[in-house]
């Protein structure tokens, strides 16, 4: 699988470029092992669902590009790895001048095999207020090519031939990796860098380098609070608060934290005497919970708005965690409640008892409602993991790792249609994907019972 090869190669490259990332991987592995030993029910559930096998795979990376042409070619590059654009994220409402999607696998089997995803942001030059600076940034971006000639040739070849040979796939991974490699030489002089940096640190990060260097890679932890507490012990400067919902018995959506971005030496164009510095790359950790339905997401957004109204969300205020926990007491915290109230998505499978039903019982069970099947122990509901991102969390992570507290207010304008035009495709509605996954499992459950009834009767 090309996606697995690419994910592994990128992890090795990033470990070489940012040694602290290797420490982060070790920390997460230690915490996951301890958590599974302490929680046998969690271990059993992850074994049943197939989640355990994929736990050690790095879950996502993130890049930022500057032009529609770069974004569109990335879509074609990721398609070769079985990754499609899912979701639209307008981060400008949180003061970050980008909008984004996540390239990831969408099928159940593909996600179990390797859930690697890349959160990909496109710079919105229209949000640079200074017209001359905006034109200068556009001209700089127009001069660069972030893909190797061989990578472009292999993309075209794969599209024409319906895939790549094994040897071509290895070559493709090596060529594609060059797009995401860090370059310590800036493509602009120090004066230009400073002007773009003053407009927004992220603008400088996108415009002033040869390509969209991977700015973080993220392993998945089963206990993000333990990871947050342990990071300083391993010499990592952790961000102040964990982004996302509070700690719960039944984790929902996504929680994220990171070690703060490293200050790295860069050499500016035309500067032979000294070196400058740039801050962008960091290490992130995530804990994933159950995916929420539209009803569940509406409740989540409503509660988060209440927390924001009580104070500055994402700030290091001492009582932020307390406010979050207090407000989220209104969000049900058992899987039975979440399922019965249609707040979260589940994958339904036959239990051993259900698989052993006699013909008449199986036929009757096939027509029963899900609650009845679960109550009788004939079916089980496993939470569907949330595979996507939270706009507010993503913006909070970006802000904390760009080295400042500025929250530049851009007009709250979600330009999804323009983004899709630049991308060259529509993005998937992520909630629709979870709806389909849940319905597939229900259909398969009923089909299995009907097949069992026919088989036993025969």
Question: What is the predicted function of each stretch?
Answer:
Residues 1-458:
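Extended, well-ordered protein cores
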């Amino acid at each position: 699988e090309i996606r697995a090869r690419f994910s592994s190669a990128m992890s090795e490259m990033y470990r070489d470029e940012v040694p602290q990332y290797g420490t982060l991987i070790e920390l997460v592995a230690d915490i996951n092992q301890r958590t599974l030993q302490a929680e046998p029910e969690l271990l059993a559930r992850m074994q049943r669902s197939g989640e355990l096998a994929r736990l050690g795979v790095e879950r996502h990376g993130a890049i930022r590009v500057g032009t529609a042409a770069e974004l569109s070619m990335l879509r074609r590059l990721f398609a070769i790895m079985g990754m499609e654009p899912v979701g639209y994220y307008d981060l400008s409402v949180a003061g970050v001048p980008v909008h984004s999607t996540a390239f990831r696998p969408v099928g159940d089997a593909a996600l179990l095999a390797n859930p690697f995803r890349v959160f990909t942001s496109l710079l919105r030059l229209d949000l640079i207020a200074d017209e001359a600076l905006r034109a200068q940034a556009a001209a700089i971006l127009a001069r660069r090519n972030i893909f190797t000639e061989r990578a472009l040739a292999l993309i075209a070849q794969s599209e024409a031939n319906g895939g790549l040979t094994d040897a071509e796939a290895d070559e493709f991974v090596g060529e594609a990796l060059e797009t995401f490699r860090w370059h310590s030489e800036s493509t602009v002089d120090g004066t230009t860098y400073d002007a773009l940096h003053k407009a927004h640190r992220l603008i400088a990060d996108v415009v002033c380098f040869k390509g969209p260097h991977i700015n973080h890679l993220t392993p998945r932890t089963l206990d993000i609070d333990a990871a947050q507490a342990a990071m300083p012990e391993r010499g990592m400067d952790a961000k102040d608060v964990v982004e996302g919902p509070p700690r719960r018995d039944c984790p929902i959506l996504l929680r994220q934290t990171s070690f703060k971005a490293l200050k790295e030496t860069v050499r500016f164009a035309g500067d032979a005497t000294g070196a400058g510095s740039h801050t962008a790359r960091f290490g992130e950790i995530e804990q994933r919970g159950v995916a929420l339905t539209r009803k569940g997401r509406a409740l989540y957004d409503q509660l988060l708005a209440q927390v924001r109204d009580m104070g500055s969300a994402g700030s290091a205020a001492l009582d932020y965690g307390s406010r979050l926990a207090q407000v989220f007491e209104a969000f049900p915290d058992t899987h039975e409640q979440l399922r019965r109230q249609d707040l979260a998505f589940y994958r339904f499978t036959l239990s051993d008892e259900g698989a052993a039903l006699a013909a008449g019982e199986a036929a009757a069970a096939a027509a029963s409602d899900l609650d009845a099947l679960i109550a009788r122990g004939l079916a089980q509901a496993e939470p569907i993991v949330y595979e996507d991102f939270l706009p507010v969390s993503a913006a909070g992570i970006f802000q904390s790792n760009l080295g400042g507290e500025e929250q530049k207010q851009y007009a709250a304008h979600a330009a999804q249609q323009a983004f899709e035009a630049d991308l060259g495709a529509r993005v998937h509605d992520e909630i629709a994907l979870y709806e389909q996954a849940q319905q597939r499992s229900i259909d398969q459950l009923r089909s299995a019972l009907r097949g069992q009834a026919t088989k036993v009767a025969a």
